[in-house]
């Protein structure tokens, strides 16, 4: 199947990383189901790129949604879902806009803030992946690409709830890759490799916007992962900043990639004999 016949469902598609990835995929002939809670942002995306029948917006708030219903609506519109990009995220700005200068202690985070981050950054990945994966398995081809964050961000003080919720997504990605091994459906992670110039970084942040990474940093690893060259690549995480455009794609992927999570530190528990 050619790119022009592949359909991508991408969450958080109205702005930031999701918008850049969606546009990049549209430009290469993919059909894109753009999911976001921001209806105006989805309209603006369509106005920017046109794309005719290749682009359709779906309004959904991932803190409270029916994943099976959303997947069915996308399949009804496009016929199938070949690629799922779990990109939507809630950052630390929901706790307080100046979190870079004054990182919140975990006990300063409200239960609602915790629940919202877990809902979007972790639960939605599980729910949507579960909703779309069985037809992928039946077709013996599929891609699930999860956007997490740096391992350091997951663990350092002041990162609650963003860091722990992304750590959950990272661990889930590793489990999903193992569960789907040999099915033709791959699971991989992409991260930018640093702070990115998106609305997730509040205006109060002490950064010059042009000094931040730009959202298009995600495109080289993404476009490689959805290509036939990556048919047998699963359980890996790729840093956009480490992708070397001067190398051949496979060599660039080798340089930018590593196993998902922290497998080099993992020791499997001793299992009782049966």
Residue ranges and their predicted role:
Residues 2-33:
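Canonical Rossmann dinucleotide-binding motif of NAD(H)/NADP(H)-dependent dehydrogenases/reductases
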Residues 28-44:
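Conserved glycine-rich Rossmann-like NAD(P)H-binding loop of the short-chain dehydrogenase/reductase
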Residues 46, 50, 56-59, 64-79:
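Conserved amphipathic alpha-helix within the SDR
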Residues 90, 102-126, 141, 145, ...:
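Catalytic Tyr-X3-Lys loop
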Residues 129, 165:
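Active-site helix of classical SDR
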Residues 134, 178-179:
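Alpha-helical segment proximal to the catalytic Tyr-Lys
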Residues 155-164, 175:
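Active-site loop-to-helix junction immediately N-terminal to the catalytic Tyr of the SDR YXXXK motif
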Residues 182, 189-190, 207-274:
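C-terminal helical subdomain
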């Amino acid at each position: 199947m050619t790119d022009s016949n592949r359909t991508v469902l991408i969450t958080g598609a109205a702005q930031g990383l999701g918008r850049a990835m969606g546009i990049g995929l549209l430009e290469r002939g993919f059909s894109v189901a753009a999911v976001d809670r921001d209806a105006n942002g989805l309209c603006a995306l369509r106005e920017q790129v046109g794309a005719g029948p290749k682009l359709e917006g779906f309004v959904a708030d991932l803190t409270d949604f029916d994943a099976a219903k959303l997947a069915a609506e996308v399949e009804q519109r496009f016929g199938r879902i070949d690629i799922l990009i779990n990109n939507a995220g809630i950052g630390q700005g929901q706790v307080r806009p100046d979190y870079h200068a004054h990182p919140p202690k975990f006990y300063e985070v409200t239960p609602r803030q915790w629940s919202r981050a877990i809902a979007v950054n972790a639960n939605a990945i599980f729910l949507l992946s579960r909703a779309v994966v069985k037809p992928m398995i039946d077709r013996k081809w599929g891609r699930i690409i999860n956007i997490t964050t740096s391992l350091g961000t997951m663990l350092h003080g002041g990162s609650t709830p963003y860091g722990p919720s992304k750590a959950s997504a990272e661990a889930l990605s590793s489990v999903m890759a193992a569960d789907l091994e040999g099915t033709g459906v791959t699971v991989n992670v992409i991260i930018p490799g640093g702070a990115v110039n998106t609305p997730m970084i509040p205006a109060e942040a002490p950064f010059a916007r042009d000094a931040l990474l730009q959202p298009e940093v995600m495109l080289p690893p993404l476009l490689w992962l959805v290509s036939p060259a990556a048919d047998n690549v699963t359980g890996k995480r790729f840093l956009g900043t480490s992708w070397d455009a001067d190398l051949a794609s496979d060599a660039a992927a080798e340089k930018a990639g590593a196993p998902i999570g922290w497998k080099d530190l993992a020791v499997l528990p001793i299992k009782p004999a049966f």
